Amino acid sequence: QMCIRDSHYTVSKKHRQKDSYSPGGQMGLRPDRAVIVYSNLIRQTYKKTPIILGGIEASLRRLAHYDYWENKVKHSVLLDSGADMISYGMGEHSIIEIADALASGLPVEELTYIAGTVFKCRDLSRVYDPIILPSYEEVKVNKKVYADSFAIQYQNTDPFSARPMAESYGTKGYIIQNPPALPLTQEEMDDVYALPYTEKVHPMYEKLGGIPALEEIKFSLTSNRGCFGGCNFCALTFHQGRILQTRSHESLIEEATRMTNDPEFKGYIHDVGGPTADFRQPSCQKQLTKGVCKNKQCLFPTPCKNLTVDHSDYVSLLRKLRKIPGVKKVFIRSGVRFDYVVADRDKTFLRELVEHHVSGQLRVAPEHVSDQVLKYMGKPSHSVYQQFLKEYDAANRQTGKQQYAVPYFMSSHPGCTMKEAVKLAEYVRDLGFTPEQVQDFYPTPSTLSTCMYYTGCLLYTSDAADDLT
């Protein structure tokens, strides 16, 4: 379940006119803080039934976190909801272990050993070698301590190297976060997507106009999960992790073939991707056994010397999908990482992207034009984006196309002063077009950028940054 407040309100805290995740797009059908509301209602009715939270809302609020809506540090959602556990991240491994344990007769309070879960306890007697985080009482009043705590959490998001973490809530005991579950193998990914999903909304919703958000993804293929891009404003590190997990070509071809039998399918696959469309393998071989590096990103500020830059598997997959009978066109809409494309010396992918997979406009996310702001964002310098545009234009000329790159920009990110905002505005003006949208920075729980926004500190050192706003 996504954050309900995010679908109810803009970042300016104004009511949205439409909720794309509700029947007919109608606003107001779901309560704010739905995880807390629904969990407490269940607890009132089923007092002894185990309640396990899952999904991105619970995952990002699993420990003490800054809440933009109330402008303060909130408890772990586990305390406010009255639930017993959180299965954080994507959850397949942990939810199966939880179900098996409960089915065997174990009480829910005994389930302290499952990777990818968060639970509460009175003391630390059953927690092996935990990292003791600053207490909730400390982080809610001291911004530097909050930044220190978040830095520790950020460094413990890898299943191969993370340790349990304990956060004290005084007389209420401790919230314990176990290390993340191991990433799914390709076989496991295929098994997940081979399940008999109806891919339809409940019939009762159809009468109310359906769920608008479903139309956007109905004929799209999820080919991967996880992202080693490392953007500071993105919550994926906390939710899906940095290790790439992919589906096999066979799995994706089978799903695409099923799509062609849908009466509503018009021959167009809208997307083949995931968090980043063109990531199809771990960033380096080390990740498969050692996990990701601490205090070091794969692409920022420049690509790591150990980075494997290779689009050949993705190119092969797209070629196979294009050949499926009944498929007229395969588009890529979930976002191409332009610095990864620039780093690839083999330009086959870029050429075929332009020739076959762009629906007139390619959406890319440079986010800003100020290198100082881009540094705070964890994004490559503006010169890398300019280089991508040159290569993209050249590929269009080579293929006889005239397609445009539509940039997505973000305003108000921590570190962006009026000077940088004017620089971005002038750049957009000089482009000669009005962008469809500019995302105002949204302080989502559990991101580095949100920590900067709240504390004014630059991680990992937690030194106060004079030029952060």
Question: Residues of each region from the PLM?
Answer:
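Catalytic cores of alpha/beta
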Residues: 415-428
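Conserved, mostly hydrophobic/aromatic
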Residues: 84, 252, 364, 438
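Conserved SAM/AdoMet-binding glycine-rich loop
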Residues: 258-406, 410-414
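Single conserved hydrophobic/aromatic residue that forms the stacking wall/gate
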Residues: 4, 460-469
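Glycine-rich beta-alpha loop elements in corrinoid/cobalamin-binding modules
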Residues: 1, 5-170, 454-455
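N-terminal pre-triad scaffold of radical SAM enzymes
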Residues: 208-235, 268, 442
